Each structure stands twice: as structure tokens, then as C-alpha cells.
């Protein structure tokens, strides 16, 4: 699982890298933006696909065409970030997420990453069929169920 911890400025390629992570946690005070057009560039690391998938096509166009900055709070409100938190709490928030994740099945994470990848590349009907038909090996299920009391 990859986590982007965003503080300060996150523009252009940095924004593309953050969106490629599984979870984005951003400081409220962070400044983000797609500034490709400002500098005569084009996205090459997935922004043209990920940004509209996260925030919607209309907002993605507006952000890309204006190259305007937006806050961490806005990023979370729009779905680009999973969590926005005050800068003073950013490290603790990320650490808390890591601790929660560490308690869960790593084998489940492998399955989720594969299935979420399918969600990005297949239509819903094909993605649902893939989920139903794909087997994943879990060696910790019995132990985890026994410990669930």
C-alpha cells in the first residue's frame, strides 16, 4: 500500500505522483495544482486519467485549463485526497492510518489492489465478473476469524 503525505506545494508531476498512490493524506494548508498548462507541458504520469476519475471531468478540466491552486481541504472535499488534516496533525494522522492498516491482512491488500486496478481498467459489469471469478490465496483467514471475538 502506498500513501502520499502531502504538505506544502504539490504541483504538476508531484500531483501526478500523489494521485498514483493508494491513499492520499493532505495537510489542510497544502497547495495543490495541475500547472502543466502554465508551463506549456502535458501530463505524462497519468494525470489525464486519474484526475477526472477522482474529481470528475468538469472539475478536472477547470483545474487543468486554469492551472489554479487549490487547498488540501478542497482536495479532500472533491475526492482527490482521502483525508485532510491540520498540518500539526499530519504525521500523527498518517501514522494512525499505517497502524490501522498493519492490523489487517496483507493478502487482502494484494487482492484489493488487483481488484481496484480492474475497476480502473474495466467497465462495471466486467469488473464485477472479474471480482466474482478471480481466486486469491489467503493463508491467514482461519487465524483471523478465530481471533475475532
Where are these regions (language model features)?
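Crotonase-fold acyl-CoA enzyme core
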Residues: 2-107
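C-terminal alpha-helix plus adjacent terminal tail
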Residues: 67-73, 88, 92, 96-149
Amino acid at each position: 500500500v502506498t500513501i502520499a503525505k502531502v504538505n506544502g506545494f504539490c504541483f504538476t508531476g508531484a500531483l501526478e505522483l500523489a494521485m498514483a498512490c493508494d491513499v492520499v493524506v493532505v495537510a489542510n494548508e497544502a497547495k495543490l495544482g495541475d500547472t502543466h498548462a502554465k508551463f506549456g507541458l502535458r501530463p505524462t504520469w497519468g494525470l489525464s486519467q486519474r484526475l477526472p476519475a477522482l474529481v470528475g471531468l468538469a472539475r478536472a478540466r477547470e483545474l487543468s485549463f486554469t492551472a489554479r491552486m487549490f487547498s488540501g481541504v478542497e482536495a479532500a472535499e472533491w475526492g482527490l485526497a482521502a483525508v485532510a488534516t491540520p498540518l500539526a496533525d499530519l504525521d500523527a494522522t498518517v501514522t494512525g492510518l499505517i497502524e490501522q492498516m498493519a492490523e489487517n491482512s496483507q493478502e487482502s491488500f494484494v487482492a484489493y489492489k488487483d481488484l481496484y486496478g480492474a475497476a480502473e481498467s474495466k467497465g462495471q459489469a466486467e469488473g464485477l465478473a472479474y471480482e466474482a471469478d478471480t481466486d486469491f490465496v489467503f493463508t491467514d483467514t482461519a487465524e483471523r476469524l478465530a481471533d475475532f471475538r
